[in-house]
Amino acid sequence: MDALIHHLERKEDLSPREVTVAAELLLDPAAPDEKKAALLEALSRKGETPAEIAGFVEVFLEHAVDPHVGLLDLEGPTIDVCGTGGDKLNLFNVSTTSMFVVAATGAVVMKHGNRGITSKSGGADVLEALGIRIDLPAEGFRDCLEKAGVGFLFAPAYHPAFKAVVGVRKQLAEKGVRTIFNLIGPLLNPAKPQCQLVGVFDREMCPAFAEILQRLGRESAWAVHGTTGDGRSVDEVSLLGSTRICKAGLYQDLVDEEVRPRDFGMKH
């Protein structure tokens, strides 16, 4: 691990092989937390590239519980709708609310989420408040998709390997250090939907997230970042100001555009 840390301290990007080694070391319960912390801090200081982030996610998904949605004969396209959080506006959970609307249009919504960390209402919190069981095993999740066209994957139940980084993540969070784990939550859906919309808290991250989703095999992906009427950032499509939308996918090159409510006949 020391060699990887020194590599990152020289501001050198990791090769795909080095990303795999680094990701496996992070998930190794026997690896010391101080080394994991040094690796994560060095990676953060260098700045994670889209290729590196996609590589880490691919390794982490290999350790995730597979819900085996390929066993199903689903009629509609599969999609996840989520956000990074972190905009600090204390909004209600828009993506979790929208999952039911999206499912009603005929798409099959494979929602992957957790309890709130940067907000008061994570996806799991909202569904639990509605009396919905959030920790269904894979068979129950598939049953929901077949019967209702919508299902929820509770992140802790599908990523048991992340127990190996709980301590170091808490340690770095207390120091105010942002790591790759603050970025990848929306990318870790073990059902691997065909389509995905991700709201991001930083406007400049939109192209990177679109590229990452493309690298992860999404047929169609949108990364969006909105602004309020007074210019504050929101990790949603905004009804109050402009929204940057970066579109990408297996069958399309990156498209970067700006939309406003008036483009759709709405006044704000």
For the regions a protein language model found, what residue spans apply to each?
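Short beta-strand segments at enzyme active-site cores
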Residues: K35-K36, V109-H112, A223
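Aromatic/hydrophobic pocket-lining residues that form π-stacking "cages" and hydrophobic walls in ligand
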Residues: L39, S98, F209
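Acidic, glycine/proline-rich low-complexity segments that act as flexible tails and inter-domain linkers
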Residues: M1-N90, T105
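Generic structural signal for well-ordered, non-membrane alpha-helical segments
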Residues: M1, E12-V19, P32, K36, ...
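Glycine-rich anion-binding loops and their surrounding alpha/beta cores
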Residues: H7, E62-V65, V69-L72, L91, ...
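Short, mixed-charge, low-aromatic patches
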Residues: R10-R17, A51-V57, V81-G83, T97-V102, ...
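Conserved short-loop catalytic and cofactor-binding motifs
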Residues: S44, N114-R115, P193-L197
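A generic, well-ordered mixed alpha/beta core segment in the N-terminal half of proteins
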Residues: D80-G83, D87-L145
